[in-house]
Swiss-Prot record:
GO terms for cellular component: cytosol; keratin filament. Wool. Keywords: Keratin. This is Keratin, high-sulfur matrix protein, IIIA3. The keyword Magnesium does not apply.
Length: 131
């Protein structure tokens, strides 16, 4: 489709083409073919320092705190400091859904939307609770 999406291989739209390992579930992230490979008896296994994400119709990477720190966003709004593929939970203020920190693990108030909280208790951030 002219993108890096696909189960194994895609076109030249991502830095000269890319390979996507089968264990990597993100349909819009790839590994460039220029990455170092290791010869195996049957296949070549790509090894990269980090995957490269490209924009999609619907973002598949996330930045729950909207801080572009530590979590992956589409490459059009992803800074160089974005390295993680798995997003961390946010810390949330007590009475509202505004994130106050990315010190995890923390939870958000049950009234917050859209995503549910993975934990029911929070660590404290300095002297104030996260939620």
């Amino acid at each position: 489709t002219g993108s890096c999406c696909g189960p194994t291989f895609s076109s030249l739209s991502c830095g000269g083409g890319c390979l996507q390992p089968r264990y990597y579930r993100d349909p819009c992230c790839c590994r460039p073919v220029s990455c170092q490979t290791v010869s195996r008896p049957v296949t070549f296994v790509p090894r990269c320092t980090r995957p490269i994400c490209e924009p999609c119709r619907r973002p598949v990477c996330c930045d729950p705190c909207s801080l572009q720190e530590g979590c992956c966003r589409p490459i059009t709004c992803c800074p160089t400091s974005c390295q993680a593929v798995v997003c961390r939970p946010c810390c949330w203020a007590t009475t509202c859904c505004q994130p106050v920190s990315v010190q995890c693990p923390c939870c958000r108030p049950t009234s917050c939307q859209p995503a549910p909280c993975s934990r029911t208790t929070c660590r404290t951030f300095r002297t104030s609770p996260c939620c």
